[in-house]
A protein has these predicted regions:
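Short hydrophobic/Thr-rich beta-strand motif most characteristic of the beta2 strand and flanking loop
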Residues: 30-37, 45, 107
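Charged docking surfaces used in two-component/phosphorelay signaling
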Residues: 20-28
């Protein structure tokens, strides 16, 4: 399993249980974690913090994962930040739209730490693994 020591991930999900489960898995593979309950909180954190990765639920209140992704890609300072979206059902049209907006990858809930690690290893290697 890949180790991601000294890398910081923002977890954006409106369900505290989902955030906790994702955080526990991320801590297990070496990430430090920050949390947001919605897309608006996530944007505020991203603008103030150096991050290596964002994992966001596609279906959140106030600003959903697609809207968050669109805002990240539109901002010159954030546009290269790797974004992995999470979802309960892998609807093809949703995945297609997210890829068009610049999603790096996605995970279908529930997922285990091995699947998370494998996905993030691929995403970090593809994007160069550098903090913004």
């Amino acid at each position: 399993m890949a180790k991601f020591d000294n890398q910081i991930c923002l977890i954006a999900d409106d369900y505290s249980t989902a955030r906790r489960l994702i955080k526990d898995s991320l801590l297990h593979i070496g990430f430090s974690c920050l949390e947001a309950e919605n897309g608006n909180q996530a944007i505020a954190i991203i603008q103030q913090t150096t991050l290596d990765l964002v994992i966001a639920d596609i279906n959140m209140p106030e600003k959903n994962g697609l809207e968050l992704l669109k805002d990240i890609r539109a901002d010159e300072n954030m546009k290269d930040l790797p974004v992995v979206l999470t979802m309960l059902e892998p609807f093809e049209d949703l995945i297609f739209d997210a890829k068009k907006l610049g999603m790096n990858d996605y995970l279908v809930k529930p997922f285990d730490v091995f699947t998370l690690s494998k996905t993030l290893d691929k995403v970090i290697k593809t994007t160069g693994g550098e903090s913004l």
